[in-house]
From Swiss-Prot:
The keyword Cell wall biogenesis/degradation does not apply. It holds the Pfam family Kinase-PPPase. It catalyses: N(tele)-phospho-L-histidyl/L-threonyl-[pyruvate, phosphate dikinase] + ADP = N(tele)-phospho-L-histidyl/O-phospho-L-threonyl-[pyruvate, phosphate dikinase] + AMP + H(+); N(tele)-phospho-L-histidyl/O-phospho-L-threonyl-[pyruvate, phosphate dikinase] + phosphate + H(+) = N(tele)-phospho-L-histidyl/L-threonyl-[pyruvate, phosphate dikinase] + diphosphate. InterPro entries: Kinase-pyrophosphorylase, PPDK_reg. Its EC number is 2.7.11.32, 2.7.4.27. It comes from Clostridium botulinum (strain Eklund 17B / Type B). ADP binds at G147, L148, S149, R150, T151, S152, K153, T154. This is Putative pyruvate, phosphate dikinase regulatory protein.
Length: 272
């Protein structure tokens, strides 16, 4: 039986996936052995006694570091072992075309995967706790958005989620109040969304027109009701002592940027 060693200086996920794709093209049984975290020449030497025990073998390598990659290749040639360096030739070709040197960062793909899954997790979080569906996520939230109806809480939550930030949004309504749990979390996480009364009236009227709603429309988009809600939201935000952001005539991206800067977001790692 043929054994393919998938060797990498990171978790060997890329090497493993390439090997699986190749093995799937053959009916014969092929054994795949994953060998991660080979970052030094000494570590290459350490794995060879085990490799030497296998009669029929191939090595598929995604090692990035040049000296380790070249040493592994020479070692294989000396031992008459077939080796395929998956990333090396591609990196060299692109480097030549761009006339620049690559960074040679082991585990770069894993970092990309981690960022991707962090975004997915944040999006699922935002949907689960959207618009006060459940307050159980407050303690796990990176950001808590509070504001009146039609202050862009949901789209802002989703925009932040796309940056890997877990955001929960809570609507402010005089009849309902806010959950007691909100007073127990770090106020630095809480952001109050404020808006000009005239713009809020206009937004709500357009919302009603869009769905042809007549009942209770006067109250929902009426001047007195909106002024009452604005006064209520101001009281809550002052009581919480949270940061406030005026979203009047402000794009969601701009509001998100303010929040990301305030929480110290690092765009390179999707963390803060």
């Amino acid at each position: 039986m043929l054994t393919i060693f998938a060797i990498s200086d990171s978790i060997a996920e890329t090497a493993h996936q390439v090997t699986l794709a190749v093995a799937a093209q053959f009916k014969e049984k092929i054994k795949i052995r994953r060998v991660p975290y080979i970052k030094t020449i000494d570590e290459v030497d350490c794995i060879f006694p085990e490799i030497a025990k296998i009669e029929r073998k191939i090595i598929i390598s995604t090692i990035i570091t040049v000296d380790v990659r070249e040493y592994l290749t020479k070692k294989c040639y000396d031992e008459n072992i077939y080796i395929m360096n998956v990333l090396g030739p591609i990196i060299d070709s692109i480097s030549s075309m761009l006339n620049t040197n690559p960074e040679y960062k082991p585990g770069a793909m894993r970092q990309i995967d981690e960022i991707y899954y962090k975004r997915i997790e944040a999006m699922e979080f935002a949907m689960q706790y959207d618009d006060s569906k459940d307050y159980g996520g407050l303690k796990n939230a990176d950001v808590v958005l509070i504001g009146l109806s039609r202050t862009s809480k949901t789209p802002l939550s989703m925009y932040l989620a796309n940056k890997g930030i877990k955001a929960i949004n809570i609507p402010l309504m005089p009849e309902i109040g806010v959950p007691d749990e909100i007073y127990t979390i770090d106020k630095k996480k809480i952001f109050g969304l404020k808006i000009d009364a005239f713009q809020l009236i206009e937004i709500r009227k357009k919302r009603l027109d869009k769905f042809h709603r007549i009942s209770s429309s006067i109250e929902y988009a009426g001047d007195e009701r909106i002024l009452e809600e604005l006064e209520y939201s101001d009281r809550i935000m002052k009581r919480l002592g949270c940061k406030t952001i005026d979203i009047t005539q402000r794009a969601i991206e701009d509001t998100a940027l303010i929040i990301l800067e305030l929480i110290g977001y690092n765009k390179n790692t999707n963390s803060y």
